Design a protein with these regions (language model features):
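Alpha-helical transmembrane segments and their immediate juxtamembrane cytosolic regions
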Residues: 2-408
């Protein structure tokens, strides 16, 4: 990409390389530790949810409302992407910042393929060594074991995805689409958010999605989930300030709490079917199914309610954000790509132990705690190495969206 830019004529590059004279958009400059904290917590929750029949997963938010940790992860990813690349686009222009975004998308793609190779090797080894093909079936890996040549090609095209490996392909596609979205956000944020909402609506009404292999479609429809990613970017580029009065209103707080209580009551009827009669029939017919694939409006609203309550009770300047007790989650959030990949590997390892060794409650708790401790240890090691590298005089590299935070 750099060579292409260098070889292009100055007349072609100059208008794109220089930031245009547009209305100023505030790009956050201060690090917001809440982003790292909640992204780290989301990674822990995703890990716990990825372990089948794990009793510890009852502490995750998916059991008490319509949304889950995925919404947190995607929103923060959009926020931090705008924080990093928004400033770059304003200072260095569209071409350079777009090249950085595409480079990051390529890095995540490489990480996804590497994780796929390790993950498939782990599943294949366990399935064959313990003569238990159910592992491969549960992890959606049977096609790989039967037709590895075809399946590998489909995996490279992001069409074949084993269980628990759907988030990174979504993130890759969102980053590939991000340069023009960011350009528009910096010039007219309302139009950009409106275009995102329009695409979301079209995806719902026209059934747009990307095909998967061997059948079906993407578990996270990028045409729908982009709305949450763009909304996060919009918040980072001044949207949060525009909503500050609304978020500070007691009415907003009580409406959000009321919706969270309503969602909790509905979800309890899923866990306790005998209470299902409490749900009016007309309400059930209107609500269901609450579609995760296409980011149902009820899921989006539930995330917004959670965010509104969180912002109200957890300000950016809360001293507790710098306490040692929250440091483990913050460290994991600052290295989200590596920790997510590690979590996928650890979740299957925990599932294997629970099936082949012992699956009691104590083992489930021990494996869950051990997995999180390993994730924290690796995040601390990565942070230490980054510190040593910077002290050693290594030239500072531009931040990427995994290591960034901005003020909300």
């Amino acid at each position: 990409m750099r060579n292409q830019i260098a070889d292009a004529s100055p007349e072609l590059v100059a208008p794109l390389a220089r930031p245009a004279a547009v209305s100023p958009v505030v790009v956050p400059t201060e690090r917001d530790l809440r982003l790292d904290l909640f992204r780290g917590l989301a990674l822990w929750l995703i890990f716990l949810d990825h372990i089948p029949t794990n009793i510890v997963s009852w502490i995750t938010i998916r059991n008490y409302g319509f949304s889950d940790a995925t919404e947190i992860f995607i929103f923060i990813s959009g926020y931090t992407a705008a924080f990093v690349y928004g400033r770059s686009m304003r200072e260095r222009g569209f071409v350079v910042s777009s090249a950085r975004i595409l480079k990051r998308a390529w890095q995540i793609y490489v990480a996804h393929i590497f994780l796929f190779a390790i993950y498939m090797a782990e599943i294949a080894y366990v399935s064959s060594s313990f003569e238990n093909p159910l592992f491969a079936e549960e992890m959606n890996a049977l096609d790989f074991l039967k037709n590895p040549d075809v399946t590998i090609i489909q995996a490279l095209l992001l069409k074949f995805k084993p269980a628990n490996m759907d988030i990174l392909p979504l993130y890759i596609v969102l980053l590939l689409l991000f340069p023009p979205i960011l350009w528009l956000l910096l010039r007219n944020a309302v139009v950009a958010l409106g275009a995102s909402l329009l695409l979301y609506s079209l995806a719902w009404h026209l059934g747009w999605n990307i095909a998967s292999y061997p059948t079906g479609h993407w578990w996270f429809n990028p045409f729908a989930w982009q709305l949450l990613f763009v909304f996060g970017a919009w918040c980072a580029l001044g949207g949060a300030q525009r909503l500050s009065r609304v978020l500070a209103s007691p009415v907003t707080l009580w409406v959000a709490i009321g919706y969270l209580v309503f969602a909790l009551a509905v979800v309890m009827t899923w866990h306790f079917p005998r209470a299902a009669f409490l749900m009016p029939r007309w309400l059930s017919e209107w609500m269901y199914p609450i579609d995760k694939v296409n980011l149902d409006v009820l899921r989006f609203a539930h995330f917004l309610a959670l965010a509104a309550v969180t912002v109200h009770f957890l300000p950016a300047n809360w001293p507790g954000l710098k306490s040692r007790w929250l440091r483990p989650a913050i460290l994991c959030g600052q290295h989200s790509l590596e920790i997510f990949c590690l979590g996928v590997f650890l979740a299957f390892a925990a599932h294997f132990v629970m099936v082949e060794v012992y699956g009691g409650v104590l083992m489930q708790v021990a494996l869950s705690v051990a997995g999180i401790l390993i994730m924290v240890g690796v995040a601390a090691l990565l942070s230490w190495y980054k510190t040593v590298e910077s002290r050693g005089g290594t030239p500072k590299r531009p931040s990427d969206a995994d290591l960034a935070g901005g003020s909300a």
